[in-house]
Amino acid sequence: MKKADVMIKNAYIITMDHDRNIISNGCIVIDKDKITAVGGGELASCYEASRVVDAKGKFVFPGMISTHSHLFQTMLKGLGRDKLLFDWLDSSVRTALHRFDGEMCYYAALTGCMEAIQSGTTTLLDYMYCHTSPGLSDYVTQAMEDIGIRGIYG
């Protein structure tokens, strides 16, 4: 019997393979933070895992990719929610931009990354247009690295 760190069993697995297969009563084996095997329920009998997750009635699918985010804006949620886009930009975003420093950008990005991960997103493409002082984008990319999300900076 092979050893593994984690086994997820009894799941509906959305494979996203070429044929868009869905595996009922599926099993995913993870070892050293890498998926090492995916298959039907019979796969579970081939492995002994330190941690077993019974995902009966649950769906497992690959991480989502967000192709458009502004992580620094995480701190602006709720401001101007009753406004149309350009009114919101003028009254909320543009008036707040000059207050953003490195620390605020870092914690806004960190919070945004945590929210993304919590909702199943594993990769973010972030557009940082708040450049009120040099190096603010470095704080955003550092937050991505610290939280462990895959990040692309645009």
Where are these regions (language model features)?
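Histidine-rich, glycine-flanked metal-binding segment
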Residues: 1-6, 13-61
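Flexible loop residues that form catalytic
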Residues: 16, 70, 129
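Short capping/connector residues at structural and topological boundaries
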Residues: 19, 27-28, 65-66, 94, ...
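Alpha-helix boundary/interfacial micro-motifs
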Residues: 21, 27-28, 34, 42-43, ...
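Short C-terminal domain-edge/linker segments immediately following a structured domain
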Residues: 37-44, 67-69, 83-84, 94-97, ...
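Hydrophobic faces of well-ordered beta-strands that scaffold small-molecule active sites
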Residues: 63-67, 124-126, 151-154
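Alpha-helical scaffold segments that flank or form the walls of functional sites
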Residues: 77-127, 131-149
